[in-house]
């Protein structure tokens, strides 16, 4: 147990003030051998982690219960007309696409497109698939399952082979 969270990438990270001072000293003295290790760290170490980014629930939530199968996905950036749900070869496909349009700040444009595919369990009845989009932008897709292998229980009798007469057993031993 530790008192502080350990992140192996912290070895390469420094505070903005430390980076400023190190860069100032490095530029002043320009001694390549004294460069800190963070200056040679790979570029991807300075990228924000996925949990720090505001990318929403990109994977969705899959609910696979005994009698139903459901998928919930956050599609709040899309209008209902920009979404499609289909089933292809036991695969549930959710697709969203909106064409390029100017962003709200007016500095550029935004175009979004995604495809999410989920393999349907064998028990899912494709005819019962329904979808619903909430007012908060959560798409819920539900389907019923058929009962698989539900047979009544029964006792299976054990058949024992007949005992051999004792006379035959003695002759076999000799």
Swiss-Prot record:
For region Disordered, the annotated ranges are 153-174
Sorted UniProt keywords: Stress response
Question: In which residue ranges is the amino acid composition biased (Basic and acidic residues)?
Answer: 161-174
Might you name a Gene Ontology BP term for this protein? Answer: response to heat
Task: Give the signal peptide as a residue range, or say none if absent.
Answer: none
Transport keyword on record: no
What molecular functions are annotated in GO for this chain? Answer: unfolded protein binding
Q: Which InterPro entries match?
A: A-crystallin/Hsp20_dom (IPR002068), Alpha-crystallin/sHSP_animal (IPR001436), HSP20-like_chaperone (IPR008978)
- Which cellular component, as a GO term, is one annotated location? nucleus
Return the PROSITE patterns for the record: SHSP
Which positions fall inside the sHSP domain? 50-161
Pfam families found in the cross-reference section = HSP20
Coiled-coil region list = none
Q: Which domain of life is it from?
A: Eukaryota
Query: Which family is it part of?
Result: Belongs to the small heat shock protein (HSP20) family.
- Spell out the protein name for this chain: Small heat shock protein OV25-1
Q: Which organism is it from?
A: Onchocerca volvulus
UniProt lineage: Eukaryota, Metazoa, Ecdysozoa, Nematoda, Chromadorea
């Amino acid at each position: 147990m530790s008192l502080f969270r350990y992140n192996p990438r912290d070895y390469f990270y420094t505070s903005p003030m430390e980076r400023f001072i190190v860069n100032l000293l490095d530029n002043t003295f320009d001694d390549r051998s004294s460069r800190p290790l963070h200056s040679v760290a790979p570029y991807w170490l300075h990228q924000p982690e996925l949990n720090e980014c505001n990318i929403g629930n990109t994977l969705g939530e899959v609910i696979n219960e005994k009698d139903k199968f459901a998928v919930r996905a956050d599609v709040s950036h899309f209008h209902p007309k920009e979404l499609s749900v289909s089933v292809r070869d036991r695969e549930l496909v959710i697709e969203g696409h909106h064409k390029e349009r100017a962003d709200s700040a007016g500095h550029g444009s935004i175009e979004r497109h995604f495809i999410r595919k989920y393999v349907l369990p064998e028990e899912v009845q494709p005819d019962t698939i329904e979808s619903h989009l909430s007012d908060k932008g959560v798409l819920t897709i539900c389907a019923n399952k058929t009962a698989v292998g539900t047979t009544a229980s029964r006792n299976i009798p054990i058949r024992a082979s007949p005992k051999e007469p004792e006379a035959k057993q003695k002759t076999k031993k000799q």
